[in-house]
């Protein structure tokens, strides 16, 4: 088979270059806010992940396997957060611990637009602070990260405690998680679908819907409003009590990142005060967020925010006419100057070399021919402006100033 497994993706040079630029911009924003990177293994022991994500994820979505030469069960990373909890228990970093991880994760989900089985996540988390300013910093940073990438996004924001208060008010506190999971499907199945499913488990379904539609401020704790008060761009915030994502582990503020015209969130996160200490048997407050790079690329290309115009990192192609060895030495001198240089390795004629350069869209040429060499010169050419210039070989550093 020449196709990769369903739900995974090959990245061509154009796509990989775009991916690298996106990651670089995200990292620059994360670092601006004082976050440092860590890297955890792509594979964990199954016992590390077991019991952390809920029954449905464990049975249907986690990639679990055992190799013939081992008796242990392993699993591919389902997210970046449980590995962070394991890392924290092992290394006990000084608090607050502000880390980011940009890595692949795996979920055996049904592939569709914007959804993959192997995908990249850019996570950032603050471990150790229970205060609203930590939550607000995550929201501010995520807004800035998306804007740096060219996206005009808005954040749907809510708080688990608000929905808990609402459900408690109608007398169904014991069914909170079950009710929250149904409410979380509002965007997919609509009000009528949610109402129908709620009626199957409670006789307070219509009252719940009524309260949800009112989106009442009374249910939100004061800590939530302190978070919102610290958000710099409040026009990017849409408070929505129907947002009920991840309440198996989120304990406070939750958010999702949306862009108009795209049918799923581009990222999300929230406060989870009961997870990080799960391995060290203590309560460690934490809040974080994640940028889904795969759907980000999909929607960015679709809306013209990104393009695949850049096909190579190569700045200069050294083109030779029957003088390969001399051209080889010149190419290496240019590399010593810090330039990215291509030289043909198939000993092709001038026409074939140029066909490759055009296909790869390499802008600058250094042409090495017998006549120029006799005068200790090379010809520098800008394919975009069509300008040509003779450069003495002893002054090759001049080329560096001509390359944009």
Curated annotation (Swiss-Prot):
InterPro entries in the cross-refs: aa-tRNA-synth_II, aa-tRNA-synth_II/BPL/LPL, Anticodon-bd, Anticodon-bd_dom_sf, His-tRNA-ligase, HisRS-like_core, HisRS/HisZ
GO biological process, one term: histidyl-tRNA aminoacylation
UniProt keyword annotations, A-Z: Aminoacyl-tRNA synthetase, ATP-binding, Cytoplasm, Ligase, Nucleotide-binding, Protein biosynthesis
A cellular-component GO term for this protein: cytosol
Protein location: Cytoplasm
EC number: 6.1.1.21
KW Aminoacyl-tRNA synthetase (keyword) present: yes
Disulfide partners: none
Single GO term (MF): ATP binding
Keyword Nuclease: no
Domain of life: Archaea
Catalysed reactions listed for this entry: tRNA(His) + L-histidine + ATP = L-histidyl-tRNA(His) + AMP + diphosphate + H(+)
One Pfam entry name: tRNA-synt_His
Family, similarity comment: Belongs to the class-II aminoacyl-tRNA synthetase family.
Stated name of the protein: Histidine--tRNA ligase
Organism from which the protein derives: Nanoarchaeum equitans (strain Kin4-M)
